[in-house]
Amino acid sequence: MAKLRAGREDRRVIYTKNAIKDALLELMQEKSFEKLSISGVCEAAQITRTTFYSHYDSLDQVLDELINEAFEVAEYSSTTLSMSFPQRLNYLLQFDTVEVLREHNSDLPTCQRIADMPKYRVLFQDRTLSEYIKNKLFRMMKPSVVPEIMEYCRISQAEAERMFRYMLSGSYEVNSSLNWIKNDEWFASRLAILRVETAGLEAIRAANLNSGK
């Protein structure tokens, strides 16, 4: 009996949290995140402020959960998870036209597919959140990507972190300028950036190998 009651309570918690997150995303179709209020989200979700605070401390906490969800969805659909970051870039170079790269969208890095699901795209289209999301993505991906760049390019952790931040921020800004819509222009830009990133990594690796690092 206790297990049954706990199960019902768990479902109720999930339902309420989903209602809050859906309400926030719905409101962001009309206004930026910084202009939202807890009262407004509660009204849209048809819950009380007390109910909101029983699940979240702030709207920032709701936002973090949504970004995590978007990242997990994108990561789950990846077909190149077993590859290191440099390996993936080299692998993608074989798809040398917009049409072919589009067919292999699932091979792109997670950060390039994080806004593929329409439900979450509004988060990334909000320019007031750009710095916040870029920093969060950097922290999420740093533990796996930075060591791979260090090993491949024969550089220090600090150098690899700066390089990854540069690549992530640049790609994010290009995506934002295209409103995160994956049309022909997006894939053409992605293809060009992919070539620049790969050539850069290869040049640094070659220089350091030649110098005996």
Regions found by a protein language model. Give the residues of each.
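Hydrophobic/aromatic-rich alpha-helical bundle segments in the mid-to-C-terminal region
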Residues: 148-198, 204-213
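Solvent-exposed, amphipathic alpha-helical segments
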Residues: 19-31, 73-80, 166, 170-178
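Hydrophobic alpha-helical connector segments
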Residues: 79-119
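Amphipathic alpha-helical interaction segments
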Residues: 19, 40, 61, 128, ...
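Amphipathic alpha-helical packing segments from all-alpha helical-bundle domains
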Residues: 106-116, 126-153, 161-169
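Basic, helix-initiating cap at the start of DNA-binding domains
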Residues: 1-31
